[in-house]
């Protein structure tokens, strides 16, 4: 099949459904304190040189259970973003302590880190295993390829694919992993060409490659191409799966085609083999919510609850968010309690979703309660949660409470604090408290210099600062602000326009302004030309 003829013309969900890799390998690698490998030999040598060994003392460490070993290993690896260090250092330390590190433990940790959007650390686990000559199955290679695409880019993923042994390369899951990379990176032409190659190899025999393409087109804002792909699937005798139905429904939502949506629901009801999942009804609820059809959304959420595994964390997260979207506060709390009962060890992500739901509902008391509960239990401080609390308090005009959150966070974590400071500065500038905003600006610059805190200037914050300078006719302040901005990126046309407007408002001239614009290669717009007539005559 020629994919180029398949379509004649003309989210988060897209990324979620661009998954192409499957179950872990059956081969199990073990690294422990034994002389069976170079890595293990180094461990033995290190243990022999210890004081206890030199004194002839043989120490005995009780072997941890499989479950406790897995928990401890994942805990240490998941905290690396807070504690610093590398995956290799952590794993080597485990071995030095006499703890066996098994491939299935490592694989489970990598999968979990990947799931929670920590691809760099997940890839480092694979890299560590590869350097120790652990056996990789085809599906291991597929997951590794996916992680390389996420951490090192598409070219590196292609190189990894091309350099694989034929036995690992010429497999449906490996080709599918590269297909996923193309779709995630929105490389339409490469994705179509790769689809054709997979088709020639008889690898397009299920819904997965089609789902990847559909997800890509949704993210390319081309939802009209999704039904065409569904028809092509059916012509091949490939039945839509639950993921297919979800993306297809999402395309109808994007096109405001509620009639088409109802037809899909009817088809799903008649399709005895339709493997609808909780995801299917989650997307249906989201579409109805967007259309303002809250009763239908509520009905879809009830169907979602019937389909979901009561122990599934993700489904609870979606339920809380979607119930908040239709202003069903009591339902949000009910699902939250259900999650805590099913999964007593509530992680940061679950608290994050709950805080987002509280924020969406404008439930300030709920924000305070949930945030306080999280702070008392968390073992890895996550500024994303603090930022939600800060933003919600500011929306409620509770600046002092928001600032207390930042003060507490600075005592308990190393940041980054840039997002929190931006939220506070925007609020202060909007309420004519520029002096306090400037103090936060100075602190933000200091944080960035001392801790290399990444700083992404929002256009809203930049414009608010310049509006303040223009109103105050503060040319010196505007110039100093430009110097600060230039430390992160070259000044652009919009920024220079703000600066020149400040000069004009202050009725001051800048004889070298035209030269500055030329040196910085700023395109002179008509607006700038008019301003220069008075600022740089």
Swiss-Prot record:
InterPro entries on file: Pentatricopeptide_rpt (IPR002885), TPR-like_helical_dom_sf (IPR011990)
The residue spans of each PPR repeat are 171-205, 206-240, 241-275, 277-307, 312-346, 347-377, 382-416
Highest taxon of the lineage:
Eukaryota
Give an example GO molecular function: mRNA binding
| One Pfam family from the record | PPR
Location(s), subcellular: Mitochondrion
The transit peptide segment here is: 1-18
Question: Do the record's keywords include Protein transport?
Answer: no
Q: What is its main location?
A: mitochondrion
- What cellular component GO annotations does this protein have? mitochondrion
Asked if tRNA-binding is a keyword of the record, the answer is: no
* Keyword annotations of the record: Mitochondrion, Repeat, Transit peptide
Family statement: Belongs to the PPR family. P subfamily.
Its recorded name reads Pentatricopeptide repeat-containing protein At1g02370, mitochondrial
| Species per Swiss-Prot/TrEMBL record | Arabidopsis thaliana
Q: What lineage, starting at the top, does this entry show?
A: Eukaryota, Viridiplantae, Streptophyta, Embryophyta, Tracheophyta
């Amino acid at each position: 099949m020629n994919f180029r003829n398949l379509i004649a013309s003309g989210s988060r969900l897209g990324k979620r459904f661009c998954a192409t890799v499957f179950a872990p390998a059956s081969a199990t690698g073990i690294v422990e304190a034994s002389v069976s490998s170079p890595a293990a030999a180094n461990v033995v040598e290190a243990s022999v040189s210890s004081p206890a060994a030199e004194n002839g003392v043989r120490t005995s460490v009780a072997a941890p259970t499989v479950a406790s070993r897995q928990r401890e290993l994942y805990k240490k690896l998941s905290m690396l973003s807070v504690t610093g260090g590398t995956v290799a250092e952590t794993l080597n330390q485990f071995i030095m302590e006499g703890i066996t590190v098994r491939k299935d433990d490592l694989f489970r940790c990598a999968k979990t880190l990947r799931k929670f959007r920590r691809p760099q650390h997940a890839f480092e686990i694979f890299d560590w295993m590869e350097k120790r000559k652990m056996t990789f199955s085809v599906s291991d290679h597929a997951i590794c390829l996916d992680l390389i695409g996420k951490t090192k880019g598409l070219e590196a993923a292609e190189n990894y694919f091309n350099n694989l042994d034929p036995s690992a390369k010429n497999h449906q899951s490996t080709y599918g992993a590269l297909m996923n990379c193309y779709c995630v990176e929105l490389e339409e032409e490469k994705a179509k060409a790769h689809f054709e190659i997979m088709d020639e190899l008889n690898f397009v025999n299920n819904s997965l490659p089609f789902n990847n393409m559909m997800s890509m087109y949704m993210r390319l804002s081309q939802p009209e191409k999704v039904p065409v792909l569904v028809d092509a699937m059916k012509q091949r005798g490939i039945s839509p799966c639950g993921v297919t139905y979800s993306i297809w429904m999402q395309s109808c939502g994007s096109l405001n085609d509620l009639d088409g949506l109802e037809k899909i629901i009817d088809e799903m009801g008649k399709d005895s083999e339709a493997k609808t999942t909780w995801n299917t009804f989650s997307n249906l609820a989201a579409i109805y919510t967007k259309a303002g059809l809250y009763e239908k959304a509520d009905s879809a959420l009830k169907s979602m609850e019937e389909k979901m595994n009561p122990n599934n964390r993700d489904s609870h997260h979606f339920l809380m968010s979607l119930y908040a979207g239709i202003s069903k506060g009591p339902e949000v709390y009910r699902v939250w309690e259900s999650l805590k009962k099913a999964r007593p060890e509530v992680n940061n992500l679950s608290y994050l979703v709950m805080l987002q739901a509280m924020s969406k509902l404008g439930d300030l008391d709920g924000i305070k309660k949930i945030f306080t509960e999280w702070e008392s239990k968390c073992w890895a401080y996550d500024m994303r949660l603090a930022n939600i609390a800060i933003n919600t308090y500011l929306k409620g005009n509770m600046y002092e409470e928001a600032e207390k959150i930042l003060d507490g966070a600075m005592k308990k974590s190393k940041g980054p604090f840039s997002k929190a400071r931006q939220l506070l500065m925007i609020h202060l500038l909007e309420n004519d408290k520029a002096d306090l905003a400037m103090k936060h600006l100075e602190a933000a610059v200091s944080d960035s210099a001392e801790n290399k805190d990444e700083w992404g200037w929002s256009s809203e914050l930049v414009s608010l600062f310049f509006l303040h300078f223009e109103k105050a006719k503060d040319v010196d302040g505007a110039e100093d602000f430009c110097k600060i901005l230039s430390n992160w990126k070259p000044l652009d046309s919009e920024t220079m326009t703000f600066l020149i407007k400040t000069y004009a408002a202050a009725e001051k001239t800048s004889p070298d302004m035209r030269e500055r614009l030329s040196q910085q290669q700023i395109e002179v717009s008509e607006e700038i030309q008019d301003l220069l007539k008075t600022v740089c005559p």
